[in-house]
Structure formats: structure tokens, C-alpha cells
A protein has these predicted regions:
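Mid-domain alpha/beta scaffold segments of enzyme catalytic cores
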Residues: 1-259
């Protein structure tokens, strides 16, 4: 059975069939799902999903795109929600310079990234990192915090080079692998997956985004994760069953969701 470590079932893309889709997960080989907040508006939606579905867990945090909207009250709410039994991580948090080119924007993102990492450290929770076009700054901040003592975490939708992957792996962190690994042109990620130990990989969708082949361009869901597991298996010369088993154990260990 598969654990999806990063999903967004609160997204409006699921408004028409959320209930039916989630109720089909077990028969589709999906055992557990972590619904990850990205905005303040998603906090209560994630809580509702956690409370309604026994197999849905949560991660609470603010995506870097919304860093400029964060206040002290936002951070207090993240801390409060992190105390819930099924809230298993702080995320998704990090840096995204793709649309944010100005140094002032970078400074705001870094400040809020650090503030949320502080919560993860103080509450002894793992983190889920979003990083886009911000490889060096993300790595430097994460390294600083890991040296200061952190529970661990996942680099979500890992997209950088094998060399950067090696730095995260040396820190004991996990790489989140999703649909992109099935794309023909994803040479850099395929090299990273071949290099990284299976013991430091977890499966994720980022749904409704990043659907794997053969469903690329369509709405993604956790039911597509067997395609991701198969792609990883082929790159590593092992079975998809081994990928599913080991990544499930990795997620259970990091996120504390043994049952």
C-alpha cells in the first residue's frame, strides 16, 4: 500500500467529486495521504479533511508565494494547529524565486521560511520544503537549521541537480518524488533518483498538479502513484513492490504515522 506524502485535496479542482475520489483510495492501493496546506485559507479545509477521513493526515504551513501575507497571527495559528494529533509536519514552506525576482521579496520569503522552521524545530515536527529557482538560498538555510538540530524533513518535488541532492541526503533528509520522474525529458531528476538511496525517497503527487505519464496534463490524484513507483523501479532495477514498501516505511518513520 502507498503513502502519498504531499497532496492538495482541498483544491477546488476536486470540488465536484472529492468524496467519491477519496473513498476510492484504498481499493486503488493508497493507504494514507498527507494533505498539505499552502495558504491560510487552506488551514481549516485541511483540518476538515483530517477529521472526516481516518487515512488523511495534515501538514500546516504557508507557501512562499504567500509569504508577504503572513503575520504574527498566522504564525501563531500554524503553531496551534501543529499540536493536532494528525498534523504530522510543517509545510509546505520554503523559497520560490520564479515569479519573485526582487531582493526585497527574497528577504521576506527567507524571513517567513525561517519563522516556520523555528516552529518545526520547537514543536519537534518534520518540514516539507518547496524550493523553485532558489537552490543555493534554500540549501544554506536548511543546512543552518539542520546543524542547529531539527527533526528532519522532505524536499518536496525535488527538481535540482544530483549534486544538490547529495547535500540534502548527507543531512538525512528525504526527497519527494512525483509525476515528473515519468517524463521523457526529466533527465536530471532521473539521474538523481538513480543516485539517491531508496531509503531516502518518498512518493508524492502534489495533486491536482504534476500528473505522471500516461496522464500528463490531466488532473492528478494519488491513484496515479503506481506509475511513479514503476518509473523509480525501472531506474533502480528493482520491483515496483519494493519501491512501494520502502517508501511507505520511510514516510511512516519520518511522519510518525504508524498504525
Amino acid at each position: 500500500m502507498i503513502i502519498d506524502t504531499h497532496a492538495h485535496y482541498d483544491d477546488e479542482a476536486f470540488d465536484t467529486d472529492r468524496e467519491a475520489l477519496l473513498m476510492s483510495m484504498y481499493d486503488g492501493g493508497i493507504e494514507k495521504i498527507v494533505n498539505v496546506c499552502a495558504s491560510v485559507g487552506g488551514f481549516q479545509d485541511t483540518v476538515k479533511l483530517m477529521e472526516k477521513y481516518p487515512f488523511v493526515y495534515g501538514a500546516v504551513g504557508i507557501h512562499p508565494d504567500d509569504a508577504d501575507k503572513m503575520t504574527r497571527e498566522t504564525l501563531d495559528e500554524i503553531r496551534r494547529l501543529s499540536h493536532m494529533d494528525k498534523m504530522v509536519a510543517i509545510g509546505e514552506i520554503g523559497l520560490d524565486y520564479y515569479w519573485h525576482k526582487e531582493e526585497e521579496e527574497h528577504q521576506i520569503q527567507q524571513k517567513m521560511f525561517r519563522a516556520q522552521l523555528d516552529i518545526a524545530r520547537e514543536e519537534k515536527l518534520p518540514f516539507m520544503i518547496h524550493s523553485r529557482e532558489a537552490a543555493e538560498d534554500t540549501l544554506n538555510i536548511v543546512r543552518e537549521y539542520m546543524q542547529g538540530g531539527m527533526y528532519g524533513g522532505i524536499i518536496h518535488c525535488f527538481s535540482y541537480s544530483r549534486e544538490i541532492a547529495a547535500e540534502y541526503l548527507k543531512m538525512g533528509l528525504y526527497l519527494g518524488i512525483g509525476g515528473v520522474v515519468t517524463f521523457k525529458n526529466a533527465k536530471k531528476l532521473k539521474e538523481t533518483v538513480q543516485y539517491a538511496p531508496l531509503s531516502q525517497l518518498v512518493l508524492e503527487t502534489d495533486c491536482p498538479y504534476m500528473s505522471p505519464e500516461p496522464n500528463r496534463g490531466k488532473r492528478n490524484s494519488s491513484l496515479n502513484l503506481p506509475y511513479v513507483a514503476q518509473a523509480i523501479a525501472e531506474l533502480k532495477g528493482i520491483t515496483a513492490e519494493e519501491v512501494i514498501d520502502v517508501t511507505r516505511q520511510n514516510a511512516e518513520k519520518l511522519l510518525g504515522i504508524h498504525q
